[in-house]
Amino acid sequence: MQFQTNPNCPPDAFPALFEDTFTASESTDEGRLIGHLAKQLTLDSRTDNHAIIDEHHGIRAAAFTSPLTNENGVNALLLAPVAVHPDNQGQGLARWLIESIVQSIKGNGCDILITYGDPALYGRFGFEGISPEVARPPYPLQFPEGWQAIIFTDKGRLSANYQCAKPFLNADLW
């Protein structure tokens, strides 16, 4: 298996992984919602696709990073969604994937990496809860404790109104 950014994969590979993973862990409706989001993100030229790929079984874990534009010139990225195929959960692929993404963007001028997910998972990689006053989410959050970030720069200049990529402009995702 290997980590790749923007791999050359069949167009349905990312959406299928996300739909299968979220259907298994949440519900059929959630699987469809996140699968559709993944499809839209694969079509967004500003979004990077990251994957752990097995040469025999295809994508086993994946995530997207997309820019969060703002008025302060802060180089911000949103890490979402993230999925590990149900057959590969518990094998360390989430750790490998997230750590690889963090390392790849850390040295490339990213000021802040934001995610919305389980604090128990993301806390293991250095994410900490972030106030909506520092980085306002696009919609009210169902789980405010899931709004987290890794800050790579001076915290003083990060406070901004961040605008996410168009595929995230859906209140059902938040």
Each predicted region: which residue ranges?
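Short amphipathic alpha-helix that is part of the acyltransferase structural core
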Residues: 1-37, 43-60, 147-148, 154-174
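Accessory recognition modules or surfaces
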Residues: 91, 95, 141-153
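Conserved beta-strand in the GNAT
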Residues: 51, 58-69, 75-83
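Acyl-donor-binding surface of acyltransferase catalytic domains
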Residues: 70, 119-120, 146, 150
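Conserved acetyl-CoA-binding loop-helix of GNAT-fold acetyltransferases
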Residues: 79, 84, 90-103, 114-115
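Conserved active-site alpha-helix within GNAT-family acetyltransferase domains
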Residues: 107-110, 116-142
